[in-house]
Amino acid sequence: MPVGNSDRGIGLWAGQIMFGFDNSNEYIDWWHDVLPDSLENFEHKGAMASSILTPSVTIGLSNYINISLSQVIGYRHMFWDKDEYSIHHRTEGSNNNFINAVGGLLGDRKVMIRYLITNTGKGSGTRVFVGGGVSLPSKNTLTSDPFFLDNRDEIDEHRHFSVSDGCYKLVGELQFYLKRDYDPVFVGGAFQVQTPIDENKYGY
């Protein structure tokens, strides 16, 4: 099968069911200098570790139409590597609540419907799919703008990260793969775009 996300490049026939599981781990060692107009006159330094799991199920409604359901399950942890107190950063995890954050492990849910234009099984040929769907946010998000863009005078303790951004999004997708009888067997890729329908309920 094509490499990448577990539901990429695979079309199901009517009645078939496929379960998938994607995992992404990330570690960011970060630092930045003193911010302009900041009350904190020291460098900021730390690390951010993230582990994101995305189980999914795809069902062949017909030989040409598939539906996929997926759920993000994630955890992000900030390590604050300074002795000074900061209103911007501290050692904490995305599973816990904070002043401007609802903590938890569940992220966005996604529902996708794909039309299989071509779906080569045995032998060489193309797999071309077009799809569309919606991404549904969880409640585990930031409850205010962490950059205080609308009112700099109200800057207080806050968090910058969560497992969901709280926005409903429309999703469009195009997949194109060429299946061959020699290595590499699959050549191609997928293009996906997500766009928010509106601001989230917290206004950002």
Model-derived features: where do they sit?
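Extracellular loop and loop/strand-boundary signature of outer-membrane beta-barrel proteins
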Residues: 38-43, 92-101, 156-162, 199-204
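Surface-exposed strand-loop-strand hairpins of Gram-negative outer-membrane beta-barrel proteins
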Residues: 25-52, 160
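Outer-membrane beta-barrel translocator domains and adjoining extracellular loop/strand segments
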Residues: 31-38, 79-86, 141-149, 198-204
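Residues that define the transmembrane beta-barrel architecture of outer-membrane proteins
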Residues: 13-15, 49-53, 95, 102-109, ...
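Transmembrane beta-strands of outer-membrane beta-barrel pores
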Residues: 23-29, 71-77, 117, 134-140, ...
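Short loop/turn motifs that connect adjacent beta-strands in outer-membrane beta-barrel proteins
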Residues: 7-16, 28, 64, 119-128, ...
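Hydrophobic alpha-helical segments and helix pairs
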Residues: 108-168
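Residues on the lipid-exposed face of transmembrane beta-strands in outer-membrane beta-barrel proteins
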Residues: 8-10, 21-23, 55-61, 69, ...
